[in-house]
């Protein structure tokens, strides 16, 4: 995913007082191990006493895996936006379809790995799920509701979450949602979403 996709959210978080760095990754080319290595390298180079992570879709899965495998001790909180951390029906069905493996590329391994949703309690993780079924996943498979058009609500939940919030947005449009930006900032500040 090109980091420019996160431009609106990055700007909104800057306006909330956060220093923001964005990272591009090649969804179709890079493997999970390659993405994790880049994230670790980028985080290690940052000069800040405290760090938070925000990831959308596969980016949230990468953030969670980072927390599980090699997290910098400065990382405190993470917000996962529309991230299928408990599996992804749309990706699994796409992988089984003709040409699906080619479309998923390097991310295919993420969806074939056993799901591990454990996370060290020192990290506070929040997740936001969309409930407006508008996205490419609907073209691949029939998703149970509620979903955001790509990821089902239940695919965004796991026991170690500190907080979970469902909002009326679609998968891609959540990156341009003022409500998502405000809730992300609230969790990064306080470890919980605003109700």
Model-predicted regions and their roles:
Residues 1-8, 12-23, 30-122, 143, ...:
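Serine-dependent carboxylesterase/thioesterase catalytic core
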Residues 25-30, 168-172:
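Histidine-bearing beta->alpha loop at or near hydrolase active sites
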Residues 120-195:
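C-terminal catalytic-base region of ester-bond hydrolases, centering on the histidine
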């Amino acid at each position: 995913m090109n980091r420019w996709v996160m431009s609106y959210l990055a700007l909104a978080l800057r306006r909330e007082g956060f220093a923001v760095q964005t990272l591009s990754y090649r969804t179709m080319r890079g493997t999970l191990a390659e993405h994790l290595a880049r994230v670790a390298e980028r985080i290690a180079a940052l000069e800040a006493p405290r760090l938070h992570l925000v990831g959308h879709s596969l980016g949230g899965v990468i953030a969670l895996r980072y927390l599980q495998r090699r997290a910098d001790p400065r990382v405190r909180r993470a917000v996962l936006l529309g991230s299928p951390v408990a599996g992804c029906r749309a990706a699994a069905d796409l992988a089984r379809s003709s040409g699906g493996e080619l479309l998923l590329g390097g991310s295919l391994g993420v969806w074939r790995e056993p799901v591990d949703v454990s996370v060290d309690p020192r990290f506070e993780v929040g997740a936001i799920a969309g409930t407006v079924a508008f996205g490419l996943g609907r073209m691949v498979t029939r998703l149970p509701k509620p979903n955001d058009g790509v990821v089902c609500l239940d695919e965004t939940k796991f026991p170690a979450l500190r907080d979970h919030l469902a909002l009326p947005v679609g998968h891609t449009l959540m990156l341009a949602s003022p409500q998502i930006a405000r809730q992300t900032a609230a969790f990064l500040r306080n470890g919980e979403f605003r109700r």
